[in-house]
Amino acid sequence: SRILYVTGLKDYVMIYLEGEVRPLITHVTMKAMEEMLSTGRFMRVHRSYIVALDKIRSVDRNNCVYIGKEIIHVTDAYKEAFNAYLKAAQPS
């Protein structure tokens, strides 16, 4: 998948792809998009953002995700699940 992240605006989402300057815009809710992408490769980290887990470059102490050229803040509602993913993804 070339999807870096998805951002939502009411009943539309913008899908940002690797190598593309402009996002794809489609008429679908974030909830519906989250269900379509829920393969374990994507995670919602904010009310308005879903990120491709394999495209994350880094995460800082303030739970900001660096993906592509974007910095996305992981909000409190999603922080616990995201931190659990990070722990599980770390090599033992």
Annotate each PLM feature.
Residues 1-67, 73-74:
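Conserved binding/recognition cores within well-folded domains
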Residues 33, 82-85:
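Hydrophobic side chains in well-ordered alpha-helices
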Residues 87-92:
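Generic C-terminal helix-cap and adjacent flexible tail
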